[in-house]
A protein has these predicted regions:
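Contiguous, function-dense segments enriched for cysteine-driven chemistry
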Residues: 1
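Interaction interfaces in information-processing and related assembly proteins
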Residues: 4-232
Length: 233
């Protein structure tokens, strides 16, 4: 379903970007394990902060890469009122990112044993803000209220509400028992204007069928594999 523009099949971090064969869906996927590991080491994050910060790093890398403005940059800021405080990540047009959190040493909160509660760490009483420097006089600034604090849902809602682009964003960071990052990655799919209903339906079914990103990454799937699974090719 998609034609990747770049990417190589190694276990190193990399990103693929492409378009569906019918030209109605823009796709990007990333393996960001080493990026998240490095970010966690620098920030000295506890597991919940690692998961939240890692998701933000992953999302920002894809969002920055999607801009296609050579010297542009994109800043993703998430402020939800939770114990982590504010998450700020800046990406260049290649998807290289840097970022920080105001409180890296947050307490352990689980939805159930073995499942970190990122939403509780980030909070839901706040906003997701995107600042795009597109090498013009003024940067573009968009902001929407947080939906869940899980970050993927919030990025999805941001694009739909602030930029009017129907989007699906899925992010995953698996923190191992020794608090190291086992795998990290994600994908963003965006519908372009004029997409027929059958494209929308097929995409929705593919997202449901594929399920969460983390198990796919843990199974060793590449970004291309994940897009194939979600897009049904």
């Amino acid at each position: 379903l998609f034609q990747s523009e770049k990417g190589k099949n190694t276990m190193k971090d990399y990103l693929v970007r492409g378009m569906s064969m019918d030209g109605f869906v823009k796709v990007v996927a990333i393996r960001s394990t080493e990026l998240v590991r490095r970010g966690a080491e620098i920030q000295k994050t506890t597991p919940n902060a690692t998961a939240a910060f890692g998701r933000a790093l992953t999302a920002a890398s894809m969002m920055g890469n999607m801009q296609k403005v050579e010297n542009g940059s994109m800043t993703l800021q998430i402020r939800g009122g939770g114990p982590i405080g504010t998450i700020t990540v800046v990406s260049d047009a290649e998807g290289n990112v840097r970022g920080y959190v105001t409180e890296p040493r947050v307490p352990l909160v689980e939805k159930y044993p073995g499942k970190l509660d990122v939403g509780a760490t980030v909070g839901t009483n706040g906003t997701i803000t995107v600042i795009r420097d597109l090498q013009m006089k003024e940067p573009y600034i968009g902001s929407t209220e947080l939906v869940s604090g899980e970050i993927g849902d919030d990025v999805t809602a941001y694009f739909a509400q602030s930029e009017q682009i129907p989007t699906a964003c899925a992010l995953g960071v698996l923190v191992d028992r020794d608090t190291s990052v086992k795998v990290a990655g994600g994908y963003i799919l965006q519908l372009l204007p004029g997409a027929p209903e059958e494209t929308v339906s097929a995409l929705e079914a593919g997202i449901q069928r594929a399920g969460a990103v983390t198990p796919m990454l843990e199974a060793g799937m590449t970004p291309e594999d994940i897009l194939g699974q979600v897009c049904g090719s």
